[in-house]
Amino acid sequence: MHSTKVTYPEPMQLSGILDQYESFQVTPCIGTEFPKANLAEWLHSPNADALLRDLAITIAQRGVVFFRAQTDLDGELQKELTHRLGVQSGKPAGHRLSKHPLHLIRKDDPEMGVLDPGRQQKLHGVENTQKRQRAVLEYHSDGSYEVCPPDFTMLRMTEIPPTGGDTLWASGYELYDRLSTPYQKFFESLTAQHEVPSLRKLAETEPGIYDGPRGAPANTDMQFKQSHPMVRTHPVTGWKTLFAGGLHCRRVNDVTDFESEQLLSKIISLVGDNHDLQVRFRWNNPGDVAIWDNRCVLHCPTQDHYGLGGRMGYRTMGIAEKPYLDPNSPSRQEALAAAAK
């Protein structure tokens, strides 16, 4: 018998074209901000492809990138930018933007999500009246219930309260690096189930729900449930990242219920116990933008702004590859150490 050798993408390298723009690392391991850049100008630039290629690589390496007061952006430009980031960083042909399954019922743009607290409450059930004691449990990766989950999410805020409503991100690269070697190898051997039961329930009760492809031909499952490797390799960086834990990751496969609870609790405790692998972003201006890579970060809203003012934003998500693990890929810290030699 002849075995077929599996080949994986080569990591992409920065060209340096973004060095001309002021930027700073918000924390050492996650988050970069371009305080004065204009994304609309980048999109319309003659070298837009080169700019977006390096922006995509930067997001993949840093997890999340921030821009301030992008008032020249509208919904169509936001959709174009999100899609082109994926194209310039090698997403599969035929993969476009995610389509929300409720867009027909809401009569919305299928590729543009509206962040509205009232809508979220209606989708996910009645408001929880218990005291909030573990907000860390709201960390999640967007669309992880899909066969091919999202790559880049772009969130553009148009209305912000005077205080509150910050968003946090946690680095999946650093979560993996914080594990001991035996735990790393153990997690690499496992898969976990991601699902959103509230969407599945709506699919069973709402005749008008969209049942076509959600940004990729493979994304048609109306159970909104999918299993993925708990450790995946990022195709752009080539680094291993923990791809588990959080709101939508419901169960570790092939272990007992008790063991699954222990493993998922360990991951979420790593997030909550280590603020130095997180970054927190304050939305200061209408038009502030965050673009993050769901393949290597979890993110979490801060639900402290209710009654303090309106909060409205628009979200787009590109669709990436089916998650995979290259067992020979390095961790982020291993790759950075090798590059420094």
Swiss-Prot record:
Residues involved in Fe cation binding: 140, 142, 299
Gene from which the chain derives: oryG
Cofactor(s) demanded: Fe(2+)
Keyword Iron (UniProt): yes
CC terms in the record's Gene Ontology section: cytoplasm
Similarity comment: Belongs to the TfdA dioxygenase family.
Pathway annotation: Secondary metabolite biosynthesis
Keywords assigned by UniProt, alphabetized: Dioxygenase, Iron, Metal-binding, Oxidoreductase
PANTHER family reported in the protein's UniProt record: ALPHA-KETOGLUTARATE-DEPENDENT SULFONATE DIOXYGENASE, TAUD_TFDA-LIKE DOMAIN-CONTAINING PROTEIN
Broad class of enzyme this protein falls into: oxidoreductase
Protein name as it appears in the record: Alpha-ketoglutarate-dependent dioxygenase oryG
Binding site for substrate: 100, 315
Gene Ontology terms, MF aspect: 2-oxoglutarate-dependent dioxygenase activity; metal ion binding
Protein's UniProt keywords contain Ribonucleoprotein: no
Source domain of life: Eukaryota
Role played: Alpha-ketoglutarate-dependent dioxygenase; part of the gene cluster that mediates the biosynthesis of oryzines, natural products with an unusual maleidride backbone. The two subunits of the fungal fatty acid synthase oryfasA and oryfasB probably form octenoic acid. This fatty acid is most likely activated by the acyl-CoA ligase oryP to give octenyl-CoA before the citrate synthase-like protein oryE catalyzes condensation with oxaloacetate to form tricarboxylic acid.
